[in-house]
């Protein structure tokens, strides 16, 4: 059985997903494409030779009779509108982050999906599909290091563009840790604080960089995340879990160890897409397979909502310098883990 997919948004990630569905993954075919830049959408379809119909209107694509599932990879502020339209049409929808640009927007999607009565939404948080994070979670869940007490994490980028602002360290960068660490611990956050160390001379004038985000979970686990987006040396993701009886670390990406000229070295990646490229394939294949099975199990609209609420608290903490509470309603049974 082949799942007919419509893709809204043909920017970089949209093009990547179209290629995945068309040439790398199984059980899916891109039959419809839309973008606000209609000529770009036509060019993508022609360049890839996929024969998909190009729609000028995203809502027409969503409601097209031959489109069975939707991928939303358009500009972030449009996500809520298109996801709600997909739910109304009763069609499964994979939405790249953010699910919506506000916590209330995410809650609107949660409410619409629960009213529909069936999970239709998967959010594009890819790290739970990364082999390294899955291995780390397996160690935690096995009890081999006892209960997790502390996590020491880092999210480092070589550099960022002029448009990158201080709050984007939360909304664009930390958001991945917000999601994956909650999944890793099977826990939710109750407070956030942000500390600004000495500013790097390499940071843009308007940007506070690095930042340290301190999170506390409902079970009492303490998490510190260093966000440093001008580290210069590469793209580097670190996660160390300190348990009662041992420590577990996220494995480094596989690379050749080089002994040469009196040095022992390993390559460090520079592009985030290279670091998690396999996870992108796995998450989208999971969505395709889950739609075929009639039951979505990946990151949910509830996960998107809780990430947005947590991010809002972190941004508030950036401004206040205080420990900000993170207040979440109880997770509905509708979103209980499968």
UniProtKB/Swiss-Prot annotation:
Enzyme Commission designation: 1.1.1.18
GO biological process: one example: inositol catabolic process
Single Gene Ontology MF annotation: inositol 2-dehydrogenase (NAD+) activity
Keyword Phosphoprotein listed: no
Superkingdom field: Bacteria
Subunit annotation: Homotetramer.
Family listed: Belongs to the Gfo/Idh/MocA family.
Name by which UniProt lists this protein: Inositol 2-dehydrogenase
Natural source organism: Azotobacter vinelandii (strain DJ / ATCC BAA-1303)
Gene: iolG
